[in-house]
Amino acid sequence: MEKPILKVENLSKIYHTAKAEVIAVSNFTYEFVKGNFIAIVGPSGCGKSTILNILANLDSASNGKIKFEDNIKIGYMLQQDALFDWLTVMDNCLLGLKLQKNLNEQTKEYVVNLLNTYGLGDFINSYPNVLSGGMRQRVG
């Protein structure tokens, strides 16, 4: 078996409210291997988003260990997209590259190819308000 790019051991998240202690995640353990497709499924409120938020460093765990392979980058699409309505589809896609100072002709071409692959090529110069919900998520 390949070396995992991400190891999660006994991850737990407990929320404290005025009335009670809520266990959102209890002892989640998993080894993520490069190239594998993973689906975290379950009923509403079972901790799926909490796990993803912790892995994306948007929230902290109450307990457990998370070990990333060196130089790994994690991408995560939230349920609600975060597109800027005043930017075109292309400009929304290029924004992260601009902020990281990684924008060049090669990366622009790569983004155009991705947009074409995901059926968004005809919307490169469109604004998010004309996109369906699914299209907005693909742009995100």
Give the location of each predicted region:
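ABC ATPase nucleotide-binding domain "signature" region
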Residues: A39, V139-G140
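The feature captures the beta-strand-to-loop junction immediately N-terminal to the Walker
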Residues: V41-P43
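Helix-to-loop junction immediately C-terminal to a conserved catalytic motif
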Residues: A56
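Conserved ABC transporter NBD signature motif
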Residues: N63-I74
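Conserved ABC ATPase "signature" region
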Residues: K73, L94, E105-F123
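Short coil-to-helix segment of the ABC ATPase nucleotide-binding domain corresponding to the Q-loop/switch region
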Residues: L87-L94
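Conserved ABC ATPase signature
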Residues: Y127-L131, M135-R136
